[in-house]
C-alpha cells in the first residue's frame, strides 16, 4: 500500500541548503514544508514533485559537463570511439527506459534509483579528484563536476531516506561497484574520465526518468 501520511523531511532541507546558492530554477514554485514542533513536514506527493524537478536539473547539468569535456578533449585520439562501453552500473537490474519504468512497481523503481545513486557514491569522488590532476583541464569543468557531485549526493541521501520511510527493507545491504582510473598515461586517463562521465550521463538520465515516473504515480498524473 502506498504511504500517504505527512512525513518529517529533513532531507528536503538538505537538498535546498546544498543548492540554495546555485539558483535552482523553479524551486520557489514548490510548496514548502510545514513546521511542527520545530520539525519540517512535507507530503510524499510534494516530496516527489521536488525530487523530480531537482533530478531533471541535475540530468541537464551532467549532459552539459559531458559535452564540454568532449569538446575540450576532442583532439585526443580515439576519444569518440563508438565501441560499446561497460559502465560500473552495467550489472544492475534496472529499467532501461521510460516505457520499462512505467511498467515497474513503485517500490522496485525507487530501489532502482537508489541502487544507481549508491553505485556512484565513490566514483563521483574519484571523478572530481582525477579531473584536478589532468593537465590544462578548464576550471569550469572541475567546478561543474564538484557542483554535480554535491547535488547528486544530496539526492542520494533523499532517495535513501524515502527508501527507509516507505519500504520495510529499505536498509538492505548495498553493493557498490568500484571504478578504477589509475594510469600513468594522460590520454588513457582522459579516455577513462570521458567514459566515466558518459556513464554518469546515461545513469542520471535513468534516475531522472525513475523519479519523474514516481512523481506521476504519486500525483496520479495520467499523461506524463
UniProtKB/Swiss-Prot annotation:
<feature type="disulfide bond">
    <location>
        <begin position="216"/>
        <end position="224"/>
    </location>
</feature>
<dbReference type="GO" id="GO:0032534">
    <property type="term" value="P:regulation of microvillus assembly"/>
</dbReference>
<dbReference type="GO" id="GO:0030030">
    <property type="term" value="P:cell projection organization"/>
</dbReference>
<dbReference type="GO" id="GO:0007405">
    <property type="term" value="P:neuroblast proliferation"/>
</dbReference>
<keyword id="KW-0256">Endoplasmic reticulum</keyword>
<dbReference type="GO" id="GO:0005783">
    <property type="term" value="C:endoplasmic reticulum"/>
</dbReference>
<dbReference type="GO" id="GO:0031346">
    <property type="term" value="P:positive regulation of cell projection organization"/>
</dbReference>
<feature type="disulfide bond">
    <location>
        <begin position="33"/>
        <end position="40"/>
    </location>
</feature>
<dbReference type="GO" id="GO:0045662">
    <property type="term" value="P:negative regulation of myoblast differentiation"/>
</dbReference>
<dbReference type="Pfam" id="PF00103">
    <property type="entry name" value="Hormone_1"/>
</dbReference>
<dbReference type="GO" id="GO:0005615">
    <property type="term" value="C:extracellular space"/>
</dbReference>
<protein>
    <recommendedName>
        <fullName>Prolactin-2C2</fullName>
    </recommendedName>
</protein>
<dbReference type="GO" id="GO:0005179">
    <property type="term" value="F:hormone activity"/>
</dbReference>
<comment type="similarity">
    <text>Belongs to the somatotropin/prolactin family.</text>
</comment>
<feature type="glycosylation site" description="N-linked (GlcNAc...) asparagine">
    <location>
        <position position="19"/>
    </location>
</feature>
<dbReference type="GO" id="GO:0006366">
    <property type="term" value="P:transcription by RNA polymerase II"/>
</dbReference>
<dbReference type="InterPro" id="IPR018116">
    <property type="entry name" value="Somatotropin_CS"/>
</dbReference>
<dbReference type="GO" id="GO:0043534">
    <property type="term" value="P:blood vessel endothelial cell migration"/>
</dbReference>
<dbReference type="GO" id="GO:0043536">
    <property type="term" value="P:positive regulation of blood vessel endothelial cell migration"/>
</dbReference>
<dbReference type="GO" id="GO:0002052">
    <property type="term" value="P:positive regulation of neuroblast proliferation"/>
</dbReference>
<dbReference type="GO" id="GO:0045944">
    <property type="term" value="P:positive regulation of transcription by RNA polymerase II"/>
</dbReference>
<feature type="glycosylation site" description="N-linked (GlcNAc...) asparagine">
    <location>
        <position position="75"/>
    </location>
</feature>
<keyword id="KW-0732">Signal</keyword>
<dbReference type="GO" id="GO:0002040">
    <property type="term" value="P:sprouting angiogenesis"/>
</dbReference>
<keyword id="KW-1015">Disulfide bond</keyword>
<dbReference type="GO" id="GO:0008083">
    <property type="term" value="F:growth factor activity"/>
</dbReference>
<keyword id="KW-0325">Glycoprotein</keyword>
<comment type="function">
    <text>May have a role in embryonic development. It is likely to provide a growth stimulus to target cells in maternal and fetal tissues during the development of the embryo at mid-gestation. May play a role during wound healing and in the hair follicle cycle as a growth factor and/or an angiogenesis factor. May play a role in microvilli formation and cell proliferation of neuroblastoma cells.</text>
</comment>
<feature type="signal peptide">
    <location>
        <begin position="1"/>
        <end position="29"/>
    </location>
</feature>
<dbReference type="GO" id="GO:0045766">
    <property type="term" value="P:positive regulation of angiogenesis"/>
</dbReference>
<feature type="glycosylation site" description="N-linked (GlcNAc...) asparagine">
    <location>
        <position position="57"/>
    </location>
</feature>
<dbReference type="InterPro" id="IPR009079">
    <property type="entry name" value="4_helix_cytokine-like_core"/>
</dbReference>
<keyword id="KW-0964">Secreted</keyword>
<dbReference type="InterPro" id="IPR001400">
    <property type="entry name" value="Somatotropin/Prolactin"/>
</dbReference>
<dbReference type="GO" id="GO:0045445">
    <property type="term" value="P:myoblast differentiation"/>
</dbReference>
<feature type="glycosylation site" description="N-linked (GlcNAc...) asparagine">
    <location>
        <position position="88"/>
    </location>
</feature>
<feature type="disulfide bond">
    <location>
        <begin position="87"/>
        <end position="199"/>
    </location>
</feature>
<keyword id="KW-0372">Hormone</keyword>
Amino acid at each position: 500500500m502506498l504511504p500517504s501520511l505527512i512525513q518529517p523531511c529533513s532531507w528536503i532541507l538538505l537538498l535546498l541548503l546544498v543548492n540554495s546558492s546555485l539558483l535552482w530554477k523553479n524551486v520557489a514554485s514548490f510548496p514548502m514544508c510545514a513546521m511542527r514542533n520545530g520539525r519540517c513536514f512535507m507530503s510524499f506527493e510534494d516530496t516527489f514533485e521536488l525530487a523530480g524537478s531537482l533530478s531533471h536539473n541535475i540530468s541537464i547539468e551532467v549532459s552539459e559537463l559531458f559535452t564540454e569535456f568532449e569538446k575540450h578533449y576532442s583532439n585526443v585520439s580515439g576519444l569518440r570511439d563508438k565501441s560499446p562501453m561497460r559502465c560500473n552500473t552495467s550489472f544492475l537490474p534496472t529499467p532501461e527506459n521510460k516505457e520499462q519504468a512505467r511498467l515497474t512497481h513503485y517500490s522496485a523503481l525507487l530501489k532502482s534509483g537508489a541502487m544507481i545513486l549508491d553505485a556512484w557514491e565513490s566514483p563521483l569522488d574519484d571523478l572530481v579528484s582525477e579531473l584536478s590532476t589532468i593537465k590544462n583541464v578548464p576550471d569550469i569543468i572541475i567546478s561543474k563536476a564538484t557542483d554535480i557531485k554535491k547535488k547528486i549526493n544530496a539526492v542520494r541521501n533523499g532517495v535513501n531516506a524515502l527508501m527507509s520511510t516507505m519500504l520495510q527493507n529499505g536498509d538492505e545491504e548495498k553493493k557498490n561497484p568500484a571504478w578504477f582510473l589509475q594510469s600513468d598515461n594522460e590520454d588513457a586517463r582522459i579516455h577513462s574520465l570521458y567514459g566515466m562521465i558518459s556513464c554518469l550521463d546515461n545513469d542520471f538520465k535513468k534516475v531522472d526518468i525513475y523519479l519523474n515516473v514516481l512523481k506521476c504515480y504519486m500525483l496520479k498524473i495520467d499523461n506524463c
